[in-house]
Design a protein with these regions (language model features):
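Low-complexity, highly charged intrinsically disordered N-terminal segments
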Residues: 28-83
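Glycine-rich, N-terminal phosphate-binding loop and its surrounding beta-alpha-beta segment
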Residues: 59-120
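Short, surface-exposed acidic
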Residues: 223-225, 333, 364-365
Length: 366
């Protein structure tokens, strides 16, 4: 089988439509919109250029692809179904280039729902069947557009709570971090969704997304950044009795900068109480690390109910390391530490956490 055979990148039923259109049809003009009734009133359009460059650009129709598609469709649906004549015409008359024109809003643009995001039309009257043949492929733009929209809305949410709690906004670009690689359906999905996230935030662990701007958008800038961090396999490598020893090992071997540590391998409360207890070896190790210029430690609870656990962790950290008030009266940690939730969140849960923090007197910047 030929990889990415354009003749086959469609729905089965669309292969039959070339003989269903009225005789004399010469032009098909199709458009994509985000339907009214969506969760948000604007859609961030993103991902089209990738689809064009990956699947539609260049001499993509070949004799081998036509022959393969003809044989497959004959067995899949029936003989004389595949539009061999139409594809052969594109190969012979257009040298394998698709005779279509695609127009779209600039990628990254927020567009009110109910408005056209892109249009597709044929540029050769004999290829009237082609625009809608490409619908299944082009509509894959829904996924990166959805992720881009969601990240943009979360950024608005974070910005709002930073403002109302009197927080500095130095960390806004990193308040929503992408750990989505393992949750994506494929590496391609991770690349698309991960780069969509980077339209609004700079924090990501999805390395697959980092090359997207240069490879498909002629932009060599790096837009995603991460930090050194642990996972449960690291923190539990010496067992429950060796937890503190392993934490000390992690801190001792960490490079300068931000260090993120998962704290719920056994009991997050025990972890934070020991970390904040003056005079303990762990407390001294943390304070020594924080003495380094621009060093920061982020504590990451990954289990339990996110809202209540977040407030509990904030209070425990404040008891151990101290806090002060913003100009609007909300608590901020005295030291360069922070809290990160790494699992099971959606827009509503993020909103709940930020609202609960404000209600409990905590600034969003923590």
């Amino acid at each position: 089988m030929i990889e990415n055979n354009i003749c086959l990148l469609t729905d089965s039923y669309k292969v039959t439509h070339h003989y269903f259109y009225p005789k004399g049809t010469e032009k098909i003009y199709s458009y994509l919109e985000s339907r009214v009734g969506a969760e948000f009133n604007k859609t961030i359009f993103y991902g089209l250029q990738y689809l064009i460059k990956k699947y539609l650009e260049g001499r993509i129709v070949t004799q081998e692809k036509i022959d393969e598609a003809d044989n497959l469709i004959a067995n899949h649906i029936g003989p004389d179904i595949f539009n061999r004549e139409g594809w052969q015409y594109i190969l012979d008359e257009h040298d394998g280039y698709l005779p279509i024109e695609i127009k779209a809003v600039a990628e990254g643009t927020p567009v009110d729902v109910g408005n056209a995001l892109m249009t597709v039309e044929n540029t050769d009257d004999k290829s009237y069947w082609l625009p809608n043949y490409l619908e299944p492929l082009l509509l894959q733009v829904w996924y990166p557009s959805t992720v881009a929209t969601l990240s943009a809305e979360v950024r608005k949410l974070c910005n709002f709570y930073l403002e109302v709690t009197g927080s500095v906004k130095d960390n806004l670009d990193f308040m929503l971090h992408d750990f989505g690689y393992r949750g994506a359906t494929s590496t391609e999905s991770a690349m698309l969704s991960g780069s969509a996230h980077l339209l609004s935030f700079s924090g990501t662990d999805t390395i697959a997304a980092l090359t997207m701007p240069e490879n498909y958008y002629n932009d060599s800038n790096l837009y995603g950044f991460s930090v050194q961090a642990t996972e449960h396999s690291v923190m539990t490598s010496l067992g429950p009795e060796g937890e503190i020893s392993q934490i000390l090992n992690v801190i001792d071997n960490a490079k300068d900068g931000v260090l993120s540590m998962v704290i719920d391998s056994y009991n997050y409360r025990n972890f934070l109480e020991e970390a904040g207890k003056s005079g303990t070896e762990l407390n001294e190790a943390i304070l020594n690390f924080l003495d380094g210029e621009d060093n920061k430690i982020v504590f990451r609870p990954d289990s339990g109910e996110p809202v209540s656990t977040t407030i509990d962790c904030l209070n425990l950290l404040s008891e151990g390391f101290g806090s002060h008030l913003t100009d609007k009266g909300y608590k901020v940690f005295d030291l360069n530490i922070g809290l990160l939730w790494g699992d099971g969140l959606n827009y509503q849960k993020i909103r709940d956490i930020l609202f609960a923090m404000k209600s409990a007197g905590w600034a969003a910047q923590n």
